[in-house]
């Protein structure tokens, strides 16, 4: 039996947009206001403390609510394939052991894209055995948060493309 086992949470949503517009949205997550616009119920603060947004080696600090608790997170961007994939991981080596990576990826389809959010968690048998209910609640909350982020991204980008709403088109290209 392995000491730690990977649990991978994934959420995907089809969006009527282009990979470039999805990545442009992510690239424009630069401050509290832009971060809250993505998920106003849970996102509180965001700032890039090293490098440029979503460039390999850049570090971002974020505050958000997950399962009703405030989390203060610091991530390093570990991989970027423009318009296809962003991978990021906790800065802390200790946290990285249990939360090794998260990804945002985009698969282009005919006329649409699929936005995929993935979180990888490493769990030990002790946690899975003795804290099963708490673990299930925590993972369920993370999955819900991921789903809401995808739904919000879809709403924002599809409304942006409609002729009656260009509120997100701030000229930041």
Features from the language model and the residues they span:
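Generic structural detector for well-ordered beta-strands
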Residues: 12-16, 76, 105
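Short strand-connecting beta-turns/loops that link adjacent beta-strands
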Residues: 18, 82-83, 109-112
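Short, surface-exposed coil-to-beta transition loops
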Residues: 8-10, 70-75, 97-102
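Extended beta-strand/beta-hairpin segments
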Residues: 8, 164-167
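Beta-strand/loop substructures that line and gate deep hydrophobic ligand-binding cavities in soluble
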Residues: 89-144, 164
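Hydrophobic ligand-binding cavity/cleft-lining segments
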Residues: 1-50, 173
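Glycine-rich portal/gate segments that line the openings of hydrophobic small-molecule binding cavities
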Residues: 45-95, 114, 148-164, 171
């Amino acid at each position: 039996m392995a000491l730690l086992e990977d649990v991978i949470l994934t959420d995907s949503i089809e969006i009527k947009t282009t990979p470039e517009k999805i990545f442009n949205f992510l690239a424009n997550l630069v401050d509290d206001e832009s971060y809250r616009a993505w998920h106003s119920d849970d996102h509180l603060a965001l700032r890039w403390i090293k490098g440029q947004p979503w460039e390999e080696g850049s570090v971002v600090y974020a505050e958000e609510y997950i399962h009703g608790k405030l989390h203060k997170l610091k991530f390093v961007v570990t991989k970027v394939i423009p318009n296809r994939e962003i991978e990021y991981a906790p800065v802390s080596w200790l946290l990285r052991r249990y939360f090794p990576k998260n990804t945002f990826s985009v698969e282009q389809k005919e006329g649409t894209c699929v936005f995929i959010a993935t979180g990888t968690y490493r769990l030990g048998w002790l946690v899975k055995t003795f804290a099963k209910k708490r673990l299930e609640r925590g993972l369920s909350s993370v999955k819900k948060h991921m789903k809401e982020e995808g739904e919000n991204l879809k709403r924002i980008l599809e409304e942006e493309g409609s002729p009656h709403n260009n509120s997100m088109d701030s000229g930041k290209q």
